[in-house]
Amino acid sequence: MPKKRRSRRRPQPIIRWVSLTLTLLALCRPIQTWRCSLSLGNQQWMTAYNQEAKFSISIDQILEAHNQSPFCAKSPRYTLDSVNGYPKIYWPPPQGRRRFGARAMVTYDCEPRCPYVGADRFDCPHWDNASQADQGSFYVNHQILFLHLKQCHGIFTLTWEIWGYDPLITFSLHKIPDPPQPDFPQLNSDWVPSVRSWALLLNQTARAFPDCAICWEPSPPWAPEILVYNKTISSSGPGLALPDAQIFWVNTSSFNTTQGWHHPSQRLLFNVSQGNALLLPPISLVNLSTASSAPPTRVRRSPVAALTLGLALSVGLTGINVAVSALSHQRLTSLIHVLEQDQQRLITAINQTHYNLLNVASVVAQNRRGLDWLYIRLGFQSLCPTINEPCCFLRIQNDSIIRLGDLQPLSQRVSTDWQWPWNWDLGLTAWVRETIHSVLSLFLLALFLLFLAPCLIKCLTSRLLKLLRQAPHFPEISLTPKPDSDYQALLPSAPEIYSHLSPVKPDYINLRPCP
């Protein structure tokens, strides 16, 4: 009797233990996304002179906020080094100049939606449409830029260029959330130096950005080639907010104009083509929710809720596993039934062929006997001696045919159930055995969750909190020029020139407004 061979199907660990992975993922806190928006609105008065004025967003208050903010601890400290109240200001590198003086952004790890680098304001949906002023016209223009940032802990630099002579600037700085915008008083910088306007603007920063800490990022200052002119602009015109050009500029030969830009002085204010030019340092916005310096608070998690969720997922996956196993068992049983039918047909055909072969052998033996009897009656010997040939007989082997009758049914030789590691049968049906196996697997999974899941959850949460508490680190860049650098100090030695910075209100009474 041959030994029965029982096939074993290996368990599928993905189906058995995937509930543990889902449980741990469900217990992890998702990292919240955060977005800040910057809005710059400026209002200017246009006169007969179509001039280009460049304004930017940096002043002494940003130094104070930087030095006092605990979120800028890893950045270098600054001192308010100014002359007659005018602090250090910088100019960013140009990034694609377009018509009307619109300048794009200089971005690092922040991702602004608009304006695009190299695009002018009419190509960007976040710019308000504005028409160029006609000669001799007088009107008020309002521009708003909405700057959407995906990562507010990065660095961004913005240059805002407008047209006009000695413009009246009104700025607002706010987030753009779904709820109503922050309510703070509108700034009014009527005919005051532009630098003081930025001071008023930055005083509102704390209210405008309730979720942001503003840090001033050190960056090498650059000036575009447009500032390198060897000419004189008279100050006897309708009144400039800045002194004459030759006071601030040195000889053109002092600069290497082949590169298109140079290092300006740290305290330099420019008068460009009868326009006002201020310089802009990079500004960084730090998310207060992720850069908080306060000690982390311990949050107690409910292990009962976590285990309940894990057990619920395990029960659901176990039910799926039982259903899949039952369906597989049914299909395997159907296959075995079909194979048994085919096996029975083959055995019947082989037995019939063997029976026919036995009949042929019987007929051959009968013919031999008849021929031998005929030869003997005629006086001869039997057939074989008469024809002088050896006699042959047909012998049929029946051993292999007999073994076919000893075969057990296929359903008794092939197991449709997974018996490992519980190799028992107990006369139970397949459904009962599969259910018992699933319940035992669920019990082992519950024990695993009870002993190891709390430890894993604690490790994951502590790691996430550690990552969230890490404040962004900004590189410390020295603002002091090297001795061998071509850093050009353009300020004159006499500080009395700043007395000319006091603005003069132009006489626009005789000007007629635009129809």
From Swiss-Prot:
Residues 34-435 are extracellular. The mature envelope protein (Env) consists of a trimer of SU-TM heterodimers attached by a labile interchain disulfide bond. Disulfide bonds join 212-215, 212-392, 384-391. A lipid is attached at residue 455 (S-palmitoyl cysteine). Residues 365-381 are annotated as: Immunosuppression. The record marks 301-302 as: Cleavage. Keywords: Cleavage on pair of basic residues, Coiled coil, Disulfide bond, Fusion of virus membrane with host cell membrane, Fusion of virus membrane with host membrane, Glycoprotein, Host cell membrane, Host membrane, Host-virus interaction, Lipoprotein, Membrane, Palmitate, Signal, Transmembrane, Transmembrane helix, Viral attachment to host cell, Viral envelope protein, Viral penetration into host cytoplasm, Virion, Virus entry into host cell. GO terms for cellular component: host cell plasma membrane; membrane; viral envelope; virion membrane. Residues 304-324 are annotated as: Fusion peptide. Glycans are attached at residues 129, 203, 230, 251, 256, 271, 287, 351, 398. It comes from the Viruses. This is Envelope glycoprotein. A motif (CXXC) lies at residues 212-215. Specific enzymatic cleavages in vivo yield mature proteins. Envelope glycoproteins are synthesized as an inactive precursor that is N-glycosylated and processed likely by host cell furin or by a furin-like protease in the Golgi to yield the mature SU and TM proteins. The cleavage site between SU and TM requires the minimal sequence [KR]-X-[KR]-R. The CXXC motif is highly conserved across a broad range of retroviral envelope proteins. It is thought to participate in the formation of a labile disulfide bond possibly with the CX6CC motif present in the transmembrane protein. Isomerization of the intersubunit disulfide bond to an SU intrachain disulfide bond is thought to occur upon receptor recognition in order to allow membrane fusion. The surface protein (SU) attaches the virus to the host cell by binding to its receptor. This interaction triggers the refolding of the transmembrane protein (TM) and is thought to activate its fusogenic potential by unmasking its fusion peptide. Fusion occurs at the host cell plasma membrane. Gene3D superfamilies: 1.10.287.210. Residues 330-376, 388-420 form a coiled coil.
